[in-house]
């Protein structure tokens, strides 16, 4: 029993006996919810309702005072600290928007501009919260609407480092240095600054310090011409610039003003599903293909196309998607393209690409999928440096 509850019991007993109590129990509870123990005890003595209550007797062997935790306690403590705090943080046992809202509304009722913090804790098992995937995705956004301006994960970095190291060590044991090559490919794909490691570990700064301390007479540098970092600047994959050059030819033929830009990224961070997007000068997304490169049991590379869109009606029926598919097949060395849950547009497109010689076979009778086999001799013809065949494809001469 808290001191406030003990006093409330005394007041209720006195009230039931018809004694003058000086303050209604409900009024006392409202006062005690915000008052310190010293202020509450002084008020209780003033009311003649100071019960025998000793917080020292309930201390734990370690010396901790016992409290009744919960949202009301967190609110009371935070309201007391609010005049002196830049930001307030309430720790919870699980992720719950209702709890967060109760706390936020109580604080903002008295301090409307008070900033709040929320721990998106890895201690929570987020799959036991009862939230759907979409609710989890929007959870930080909903917190922001309540005034939680600082949302953090206490030891997320520790877990990320642990899982990444564990996965990489296991991959090294299973696949040798192919594991590192795959990691480097991913870093190049997302254009991570970690792909040039010497820069991030302080190579340029070390060289600058050495030059300064030696009066610029030092001849040994970490970042000289022989630095292994320069290996990571070599273009090892088919560049996006190639598709941008094709799109420039395409735009010129159709007299389109936008200079088109190509972006290739994971559809969502960490996902194996990729998105190739075509953007205009205003950064509007004009077209995209969502796909995943996989290998079958025979080691053949297959592009699984999950979705594709041409967002501007003026860009359709101009073989834009054909150019995009040509580049994807070239970039990922695909032997086949599979369209999952295909649309009528996919049916039309694959039949046309077969007529252009890009596909040798198109099977549309394999459940909810279209299987298209790539015609590599035709692909090689379209990729010749003179671009004669490619230009004819763009201009519909052949």
UniProtKB/Swiss-Prot annotation:
It catalyses: D-threo-isocitrate = glyoxylate + succinate. It comes from the Bacteria. Pfam families: ICL. One of its GO terms (biological process) is carboxylic acid metabolic process. InterPro entries: Isocitrate_lyase, Pyrv/PenolPyrv_kinase-like_dom, Pyrv_kinase-like_dom_sf. Coiled coil: none annotated. Its cofactor is Mg(2+). GO terms for molecular function: isocitrate lyase activity. Its EC number is 4.1.3.1. The keyword Lyase applies. SUPFAM superfamilies: Phosphoenolpyruvate/pyruvate domain. Keywords: Lyase. The keyword Disulfide bond does not apply. Gene3D superfamilies: Phosphoenolpyruvate-binding domains. Together with AceAa, they could catalyze the formation of succinate and glyoxylate from isocitrate. Belongs to the isocitrate lyase/PEP mutase superfamily. Isocitrate lyase family. This is Putative isocitrate lyase subunit B. It comes from Mycobacterium tuberculosis (strain ATCC 25618 / H37Rv). The lineage of its organism: Bacteria, Bacillati, Actinomycetota, Actinomycetes, Mycobacteriales.
